UniProtKB/Swiss-Prot annotation:
GO MF annotation: an example: adenine deaminase activity
Entry's transmembrane regions: none
EC number in record: 3.5.4.2
Record carries keyword Protease: no
PANTHER family: ADENINE DEAMINASE, N-ACETYLGLUCOSAMINE-6-PHOSPHATE DEACETYLASE
Pfam families in UniProt: Adenine_deam_C, Amidohydro_1
Protein name (Swiss-Prot/TrEMBL): Adenine deaminase
Organism: Escherichia coli O81 (strain ED1a)
Cofactor(s) the protein requires to work: Mn(2+)
GO biological process: adenine catabolic process
Coiled coil residues, start to end: none
Subunit architecture: Homodimer.
UniProt entry keywords in alphabetical sequence: Hydrolase, Manganese
Amino acid sequence: MNNSINHKFHHISRAEYQELLAVSRGDAVADYIIDNVSILDLINGGEISGPIVIKGRYIAGVGAEYADAPALQRIDARGATAVPGFIDAHLHIESSMMTPVTFETATLPRGLTTVICDPHEIVNVMGEAGFAWFARCAEQARQNQYLQVSSCVPALEGCDVNGASFTLEQMLAWRDHPQVTGLAEMMDYPGVISGQNALLDKLDAFRHLTLDGHCPGLGGKELNAYIAAGIENCHESYQLEEGRRKLQLGMSLMIREGSAARNLNALAPLINEFNSPQCMLCTDDRNPWEIAHEGHIDALIRRLIEQHNVPLHVAYRVASWSTARHFGLNHLGLLAPGKQADIVLLSDARKVTVQQVLVKGEPIDAQTLQAEESARLAQSAPPYGNTIDRQPVSASDFALQFTPGKRYRVIEVIHNELITHSRSSVYSENGFDRDDVCFIAVLERYGQRLAPACGLLGGFGLNEGALAATVSHDSHNIVVIGRSAEEMALAVNQVIQDGGGLCVVRNGQVQSHLPLPIAGLMSTDTAQSLAEQIDALKAAARECGPLPDEPFIQMAFLSLPVIPALKLTSQGLFDGEKFAFTTLEVTE
């Protein structure tokens, strides 16, 4: 666990120190004082009463001794509880389908003052240009948007076609950027364990920063070796004992609750007073509909308190201080003298009801964020341009021939999990022996002119129609599932025409579609508009059968080879346990 102070992120001049100290001593006037407030003590438990004194970006003092201190402005908290701003320990903003600017508008008023982001979705599509845009957005954001340098582009070498490379030389060019906190999730864990020099070179280059992991279900000697390489955390744990073992071996545990991967219920029982400094919260991938209707990190805190009886100070600790310590962000995570004034005022701490948010010492106004969003997005110079280099397809492109009596591999979906199971199904003249089997195909979209890779999918719940998307981790080729080749072709052609996006087809017609003009991943619409469009897509998808709660996010992970057990990439059917391609027909 990285508990060191990373001085790269704590910029305060000597003049600022002198002004801050003068206010702390009571010799100068504060910029803001928050009165009538109780501060949740994340270290000892309980509460601290008394004002919070702010000078510039920082907290100058806390407690009753400042009751009569002078200030330019006073904020009446009306009896609210103050907690540190929430921190998401690991996410891909692109998966929200919002730009970083829109994401900030949607989440900052909910108390999310800091994010640790890996932009490997857009980097897989357009390389360094995508990372550069995220850095520009982070530089101008009010929200603390930190970046982990994407380590695996593509996720696994030789297993898929993606849009760009991101070389070690390019990665090193960003290592010292003020918003960079470390190396993003090292997904090729077999390569790390086997000591591949190219991967160890990346780890060595970023060893003074934070090294993110990715090792779902890993245990035994392999887990020991992965940690021995220097990997410090994992957000992919989905079983209680798996999480416990990782904590025992010194890993920090990121407890994830996204739109598709929902691991909080499984892992929350691990959290206690002793290990909470090594536990963090993250969303990984969360869509705008859920953010609007349920929340972000605030929703995870609420569930820890209400459903898992986690004490208040521990629940808020894992949502802020634990993550700040892990990433060496010593200026964040506590409401204490010298810390950055990222403050969330709660009218109800148990229900996580946000009353007001301050970030870097300034109150946040949601309407101002919305009003400035368009101009700030333009200022960031988004990388527009069609990233779909694929000709329209026809039904014949998805034709598969099956022999009666033969057995075929089926990717079996587990609702609300990213892992899949591998099963087999026998084909007869009447079809497959289980009626949940539908078709899946992945089409590379980067001009390689490859034929679609086709396979079989079970457990998804698709009874009719087709769904297609260019959000398909991590290479973001076109993924389509359907009951008929004709409707699959129609759905694919719609997302090609849109320059990327999501589509639902049923009864031979496009029922709903959402264009994603930035890299085929993100929209430039407002968060509210996006949430409404997602609602329409989900409603159309539900007409196709009893699908997962988030069908497009669940579908997006069916082509990610670094999560077991069976996946489909643009290169073919991939066994995520043996880390090797396999055949559709079962021959052994």
